[in-house]
Amino acid sequence: MSSRILTSDVIGIDALLHDHHAVLAKSTGGAVAVFANNAPAFYAVTPARMAELLALEEKLSHPGSDVALDAQFYEEPETAHVAIPCGKFAMYPAWQPDADFQRQAALWGVALRDPVTAEELAAFIAYWQAEGKVFHHIQWQQKLARSVQISRSSNGGMPQRDINSVSEPDNHIPPGFRG
C-alpha cells in the first residue's frame, strides 16, 4: 500500500493525543495528517477508511483483463555456450567476445566506457560474416574493439540522431535580441 495518503486535514500530535475520536470524526475522508515539530509524523485513519483503502489495493492488485500473454514473448531462450574454435575461423552468428572484453580492449588501447551492445555486436558479426575472412578469436575481439570505438566516436561521442524524429523550433529569444 502507498505510504502517502493525501488529505487536507492536518493536526498536531498533542491535539490527537488529547481526543483522537473527535479528531477522526471531524475529518473529511476519514484520514488526518499528524504533525510533530512542524513536520509530518504519520497519518491517523479511521477503520472504515482503512477498509476502503485495503479493498482498493486488493482490486488494483488483480489485472483488469483476462488476456494472458504467452511467456515466450517475454523470455529470451537460453543460448547454449559455444566453445571458441581453435586456430583461425570465419565469423559465425553465435560468436561472442570474452567476458572480460572491456578490460582486454583497454589493454589494446581502446577504452570502452560501456559494454558492447547487442546491436553493435550484431552489426559487426553481419559485416564480417559477409566478408568471409578468417582470424583468430583474439583478432576478432581486437577488430570488434576498434569497430565499436570508431562507430561511437564518429558522432563526437553524442548518440546518433533519430532520423524519424521531427525537429521542433526553439521559441526562446536570447537576451539582447528582439522578438
Curated annotation (Swiss-Prot):
InterPro entries: DnaT, DnaT_DNA_bind. GO terms for cellular component: primosome complex. Residues 151-168 have a biased composition (Polar residues). Keywords: DNA replication, DNA-binding, Primosome. Residues 151-179 are annotated as: Disordered. GO terms for biological process: DNA replication, synthesis of primer. HAMAP family: DnaT. Belongs to the DnaT family. Homooligomerizes. Interacts with PriB. Component of the replication restart primosome. Primosome assembly occurs via a 'hand-off' mechanism. PriA binds to replication forks, subsequently PriB then DnaT bind; DnaT then displaces ssDNA to generate the helicase loading substrate. Involved in the restart of stalled replication forks, which reloads the replicative helicase on sites other than the origin of replication. Can function in multiple replication restart pathways. Displaces ssDNA from a PriB-ssDNA complex. Probably forms a spiral filament on ssDNA. This is Replication restart protein DnaT. It comes from Salmonella arizonae (strain ATCC BAA-731 / CDC346-86 / RSK2980).
